């Protein structure tokens, strides 16, 4: 990549130019044209029960099929988190009625294009660039869903019109986004083409009753058919009007949570042609730039001769940044960003870096091995009905020495409860985690061979370890 000359023209010349030489981070906003031309600045999760059409809705809006892996295609379910970016446009002709004046396209579409609606004039102009985090709806994949929730700004809750509401995962996901303090939710009543009008009305009442008293109370309910792309522009309009652009911090030291990582080299590649590992994630704050020196924590985890955990942070350099197929010179908080580094690709392959935190050297938070948390348990297990009883099983109190699954940011790790008192608990983590006091964590327990969400906590303090650094 030629990056030396000023105002370097990146790939995709039809998109806005980015120039590191003239970059002033204090002037950037989540709607700056040079930012949203190339990358998404809002993350929207799709949540809901398995087979209610989450991936189909994302495909209808963005044109990207989020089911990428062979075993996912065969079983037609999402297993890993799927991602897709979409640009939302609005026609600048005031005579065009809504919702027809809204349109969504893929992320490489130019920022402006002429109208093709008969009887209208003017151009479709880019108003939002959104990243969809397509979460699995399967109960066994709840951990993946929670990892996705760590980066969401808003959620589309999908409910299939041809099934009764709520289905088990629908309530579990709703509780999860409540924990993550997501306030902006759109409810999509999908598969409306499969039911009679009376049935749709009846289910609408069910949905209203179901969301009463939850974060989704008062959320708009939009009847759609994702398969037939019916009412998709209505969804686009609601995304623009109902989901506020999140306030972002562009000036702090950058920090990115890794939610995917891969080795992009093909087998049999010449040594000289090897590329460094790629980390995919969402920037929480700050701006990453091509050429910047970075640190990844906790890095490489090992044990010393006494069995104590040790962490060696990875130091590297950013060689490329991209959002889907768009090259970037700098990346802002928001949608999913791919960071090409000089890290040994074997450390990144097959999502090995998930749960790590990448950022400016020396500016990342501490690495914890034990956490002291104040926690809150759900009263009943979501989605699990006990045999012969219509009510869900009660959540038992935390007991000493039990092993829970803890979700911190995008990391899922085991944690042994070492002490518990009233609403305080101490948890010894299986894997060290780079996090801060005050962060929220989700707790899951193994019930009938599945991990089920049982509550959440907030980090009060913990035991940190000093990272080891090579003395070269």
From Swiss-Prot:
Keywords: Acetylation, Cytoplasm, GTP-binding, Hydrolase, Initiation factor, Nucleotide-binding, Protein biosynthesis. Its EC number is 3.6.5.3. It catalyses: GTP + H2O = GDP + phosphate + H(+). Residues 48-55 are annotated as: G1. Residues 190-193 are annotated as: G4. It is found in: Cytoplasm, Cytosol. Pfam families: eIF2_C, GTP_EFTU, GTP_EFTU_D2. One of its GO terms (molecular function) is GTP binding. Residues 225-227 are annotated as: G5. The modification N-acetylalanine is found at residue 2. Residues 76-80 are annotated as: G2. Residues 457-469 are annotated as: Interacts with CDC123. Gene3D superfamilies: P-loop containing nucleotide triphosphate hydrolases, Translation factors. Residues 134-137 are annotated as: G3. InterPro entries: EFTu-like_2, eIF2G, eIF2g_C, eIF2g_dom_2, eIF2g_GTP-bd, P-loop_NTPase, T_Tr_GTP-bd_dom, Transl_B-barrel_sf. It is an enzyme of class 3 (hydrolase). The keyword Protein biosynthesis applies. GTP binds at residues 51-56, 190-193, 225-227. GO terms for biological process: cytoplasmic translational initiation; formation of translation preinitiation complex. The keyword Membrane does not apply. Member of the eIF2 complex that functions in the early steps of protein synthesis by forming a ternary complex with GTP and initiator tRNA. This complex binds to a 40S ribosomal subunit, followed by mRNA binding to form the 43S pre-initiation complex (43S PIC). Junction of the 60S ribosomal subunit to form the 80S initiation complex is preceded by hydrolysis of the GTP bound to eIF2 and release of an eIF2-GDP binary complex. In order for eIF2 to recycle and catalyze another round of initiation, the GDP bound to eIF2 must exchange with GTP by way of a reaction catalyzed by eIF-2B. This is Eukaryotic translation initiation factor 2 subunit 3. It comes from Gallus gallus. The gene is EIF2S3.
